[in-house]
Amino acid sequence: MSERESMPCDVVIVGGGPAGLAAAIRLKQINAELEVVLLEKGSEIGAHILSGAVVDPKALDELLPEWREQGCPMAQTPVTDNWHWVLSETGKSDLPHLMMPPLMYNEGNYTGSLGNLCRWLAEQAEALGVMVFPGFPAAEVLFGENGAVVGVATQDMGVAADGSHKPDYQPGMDIRARYTFFAEGARGNLTKQMKAKFDLEADCQPQVYGLGIKELWDIDPENHVPGRVIHTQGWPLSESDTWGGGFIYHQAAGQVAIGFVTALDYKNPYVSPYQEFQRFKHHPAVAAILKGGKRVAYGARAINEGGWQSVPKLAFPGGALIGCAAGFVNVPRIKGSHTAMKSGMLAAEAAAAAIAGGREHSALDDYDANLRSSWIGAELKLVQNAQPAVAKYGGDLGTVLAGIDMWMRTLKIGLPISMKHK
C-alpha cells in the first residue's frame, strides 16, 4: 500500500471559483515567493461553475486593471440594454428603471460565461506561479495539536464502492499550509464542518437558500441581441406566492443563458422549481426568444440568499471562509462573483501580512474586520431586507416594501432596521 505523501505550502485554497482564484492571484501579486496551492474538485477549472452570468467588474478592475486588454473572455460582451419584466400568465409589463435603485442598473457590467472567466483567471494565476490542481477534491481538514487548521488532505483514488482498495489505489496527499482558505461555494462539506467546529454562525441569522436552474441555448440570429439583459418577476411563482424569478442573458456567439431561481422556503409542497422553469420558458415573451433555438447545456446549483444578516464569522485559527462559502450574494441584483472575488482578495491580503509578520495558523481577524468595512458590506447592507421582506409579506407587498427599503438606504433616509429571516 502506498504511503500518504505530504506537501508543504504557505496557503492552500479549496475551490477554483472566482473567490479562490482571486485569492491566489492576489497572494502572488503581494509576494511572488509565497507557495500557493489551489485545489479544484472538477476535472478542469470552470467545470462546476454554473452562473449566468452578468458580472460587475468592480473587483476585477481592482485585481487585474488591464483585464479588458489582456484577452479576458468576459470583455467580449458588455451589457447594451437592460430590461425588467413583470410577467402575468400571458403578458408582461416593463418596470421603468426610474423605479429601481441605482444599484440595480447593469450599465458598465458584462455578460458571459463565468466558467470561461475562471479558466482565464486560472491562466493568470499559473503565470504568477500558483500551483493549480484540478481533479483533486479536498476530502479532509487537517488540524494541529492546538486545534488550528493546518491544511487539507485530498481524496483517495482507486476506492471501490464498498470501500475496498482497487489495485490502482493511491492515498490522497496531505497539503499542509500556514493558512487554508475554504472557497467551496454554497454548502460545501468542509465549510459546514468549519462552521460547526468553530461555531462561526453563533452571531448571525441562519443561512437561507435558493435553487438556480440554468440552460445555455443557441438561438436564431434574428432573436439575438448581444449584451441584452432581461430579469423577470411575477408569473409563474406569483401563483404560489414564492420568491424568485427568471433571467435571460444574450451572450457572445449567438447564445443566451436562460435560468430561473426559486427560493427554497416555498410554502406549497407541490411547487417544483424545475417545472416552474419549464412553465417560464413557455411564456409567450420568453418562448419568442427561444423559438428555433437549441439547448446545448444545462445544470443547477444552490444559491446563498441570506445576505448580510447571514454572513458568519469569517476567520478562525488557521483558516478563512471566502466567496459563497460565506455567502456574499446580492440577491436582488442576482450577483455574487464580484463580492466573492473581493473577499478572496481581502483574505489574501490578511494572510500575506500575517506570514510576513512571522505568524501561521492564527485567526485572520483583520480579514473579517476589513471585509465588513469594505464595499462588500456597504453593498449588502443596502439590500439586506429584500429577501426577508418578500418571505414575510409575500411577493407583491414584499417586493414593494423591499424596493422602498432599498431606496431609503440608498438615500440614507430613516432608521436602519434589519429584518430577520423566518
Task: Indicate where each model-derived feature is located.
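Predominantly flavin-linked oxidoreductase catalytic cores and closely associated redox partners
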Residues: 115, 119, 124-288, 346
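N-terminal Rossmann-like FAD-binding beta1-loop-alpha1 element of flavoenzymes
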Residues: 10-37
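Conserved Rossmann-like nucleotide-cofactor binding loop
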Residues: 19, 44, 187
